[in-house]
């Protein structure tokens, strides 16, 4: 859980309607005709199943994002892959694949329904690992950003698989920068407080414990850090290694291997 959870509030229908009117008038690419509901503008292809979302997918903004949004109170900020934001903001377009209460626009990954250079800022937090072609999404995000506009993206590096609904790519800092380096000046690259290594350690250890049978879970949870620092090859025959289920090996893998044959 990277950001603090906040109480979610229902969005006033009249307020939502006014915002959707503005989005249609000010931001949409020419010629697009979304399916408009009382809650969002839907650009998904006809027949695309719309599943009831898990309301747990969404957290409040970290302080740097709050400051960015506040600076552009009179403009527009795109939140790409917003999830279910606990605070509904009139200057933030919440784009999602799922109809959360805060969703304004439903759209797929590869082509955004907005005109060129219409957003003052863009944020995408823990999203790009879940898209099949993050490099294509990055190009689209830059396309709809105003010249001189700010884009903030964060992506996991050392995290277990967490599929909402799919998980394709974790990234190093160099990998994340490379998505935008050809079209943007990279002003900073850093590890946020919610991305420090201790979060990796606790998440991996907790999920490792979760995957073990009860007896081995109890044994594993009693190990000291010094025990775990022993060479992995020396621990390979331990029951807490041998009895970890296949799905947890994939979730927490150090390496995965694929064998392919050309059709």
Sequence positions of predicted segments:
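GHKL-family ATP-binding catalytic core of two-component histidine kinases
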Residues: 113-115, 132, 172
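Active-site micro-motifs of SAM-dependent methyltransferase domains
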Residues: 111, 129, 159
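Conserved N-terminal segment of class I S-adenosyl-L-methionine
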Residues: 2-112, 117, 121-125, 238-240, ...
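Helix-to-beta-strand junctions that scaffold the AdoMet/dcAdoMet cofactor pocket
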Residues: 131-132, 145-147
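A general structural motif
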Residues: 74-75, 146-148
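S-adenosyl-L-methionine-dependent methyltransferase catalytic module, highlighting the catalytic core
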Residues: 135-136, 140, 150-263
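Residue-level recognition of oxygen-bearing side chains
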Residues: 119, 133-136
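Residues lining the SAM
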Residues: 125-128, 154
């Amino acid at each position: 859980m990277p950001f603090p959870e906040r109480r979610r509030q229902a969005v006033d229908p009249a307020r939502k309607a006014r915002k959707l009117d503005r989005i249609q008038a000010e931001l949409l690419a020419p010629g697009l005709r979304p399916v408009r509901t009382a809650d969002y503008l839907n650009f998904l292809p006809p027949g695309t199943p719309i599943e009831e979302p898990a309301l747990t997918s969404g957290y409040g903004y970290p302080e740097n994002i709050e400051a960015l949004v506040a600076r552009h109170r009179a403009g527009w900020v795109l939140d790409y892959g917003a999830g279910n934001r606990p605070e509904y903001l009139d200057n933030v377009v919440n784009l999602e694949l799922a109809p959360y209460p805060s969703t304004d626009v439903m759209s797929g990954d590869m082509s955004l329904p907005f005109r060129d250079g219409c957003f003052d800022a863009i944020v995408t937090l823990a999203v790009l690992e879940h898209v099949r072609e993050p490099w294509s999404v990055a190009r689209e995000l830059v396309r709809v950003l105003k010249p001189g506009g700010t884009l903030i993206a964060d992506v996991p590096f050392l995290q277990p698989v967490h599929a909402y609904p799919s998980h394709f790519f974790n990234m190093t800092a160099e990998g994340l920068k490379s998505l935008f380096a050809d079209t943007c000046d990279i002003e900073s690259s850093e590890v946020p407080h919610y991305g420090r290594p201790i979060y990796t350690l606790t998440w991996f250890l907790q999920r490792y414990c979760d995957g073990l049978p009860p007896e081995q879970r109890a044994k594993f949870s009693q190990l000291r850090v010094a025990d775990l620092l022993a060479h992995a090859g020396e621990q390979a025959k331990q029951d807490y290694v041998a009895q970890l289920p296949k799905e947890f090996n994939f979730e927490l893998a150090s390496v995965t291997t694929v064998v392919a044959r050309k059709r």
